[in-house]
């Protein structure tokens, strides 16, 4: 079964279908985490035919809106739920389990023809991306660099990657200059940076790994003179500052009463470390994955099986 792309539907259908309705699972959220979820679903499909899993990528913020409205069972998230989203869930009676599944690094990328920049400091990145930025050309960052206009690419405002990047770099979630090319589809961002010599963009590390022949990976200096690029080691040990981040799935507790959903989430946690490595992300240490499994067990305790 091919992996789904934007707002696609992954359907797992039994070979001989009766007239009964099929169990269904609805997932939406982060375009970063959906890559892991698609891979998990593909393996789940082979072992559990007859379950229909629908998956979309509205971005972390868009996913939480649907989650708090009770429209989906699982929200893929590239950041933790914020207080506004948490309150929306509480007001609508949506209880949930927060399950960390992996680590990721936000990659800072340029066009391969860029031969003048290998690293940017957090201070420089803030100057580029903050609201009201006066940085329009590469030479505005460093007079020795080209006078050509910087073409900026990044995720849209519903993206958890956007939220995490703006908080880590600018200092406030969502604070960003508006004049950049935005997309919730990271593949669109890859194509944008690939097609413009003077481009600069950011998105999840897995998308760089998948397209490394088309892009140049830049390092980030947090201000201590150490320029670090994201890698499995630098992300896991948080040496890649400040753009290493945890990835999550949020599961609606009431949905766990459905055997198909419960089995899917258990399968997810049992197989995610293997799958994460194959999709370009960074697996959790065993003790952290065990905490996610414990959180799921605690959520299951009081749930009656349907």
Report each predicted region and the residues it spans:
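Flexible loop/hinge segments at secondary-structure junctions
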Residues: 20-306
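Positively charged n-region of N-terminal signal peptides that target proteins for export
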Residues: 1-5
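Bacterial N-terminal signal peptides
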Residues: 6-17
